[in-house]
Amino acid sequence: MELRLPSVEQLRTVYDRDLKEAFPAAELKPLRNIEKSWAEGWYKPYCLFDGDNIVGEAFLWLGHPGWALLDYLCVSSIRRNGGVGASILEKLRERGNQAYVIILTAYDWVDIE
């Protein structure tokens, strides 16, 4: 399996298929905000590919160099409870060129149009 950035179309697919299913609407950023943040270079929506299939996601909000917030960790519903989430975290660790800080919090998302 390989952790890499998706195409924009793949991002839209996993947002609708995985993130909307796994997270309450109040905890889910609007897709347009994720796309805008990614285009501006301070958000990385990594996906774990098993061949051509995306089986999980780790979306990172980049901050000070060497630091990132794990914004979403999600595994496709058909692949849950099989170690995919742990594999995603391990592959992030293996990237080695950044230190990651994981912060879990609940918040109300404000649209940043």
How does the language model describe each region?
Residues 1-33:
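Short amphipathic alpha-helix that is part of the acyltransferase structural core
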Residues 7, 74-77:
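Structured beta->alpha junctions
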Residues 21-51:
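Active-site rim helix/loop that mediates acceptor-substrate recognition in acyltransferases
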Residues 44, 66, 98-99:
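Short coil/turn segments at beta-strand junctions that form active-site/ligand-binding loops
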Residues 47, 52-62, 67-74:
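Conserved beta-strand in the GNAT
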Residues 64, 77, 107-110:
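Feature marks short, surface-exposed loop/turn motifs that line or immediately flank catalytic pockets
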Residues 75, 81-94:
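Conserved acetyl-CoA-binding loop-helix of GNAT-fold acetyltransferases
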Residues 95-113:
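Conserved GNAT acetyl-CoA-binding A-motif
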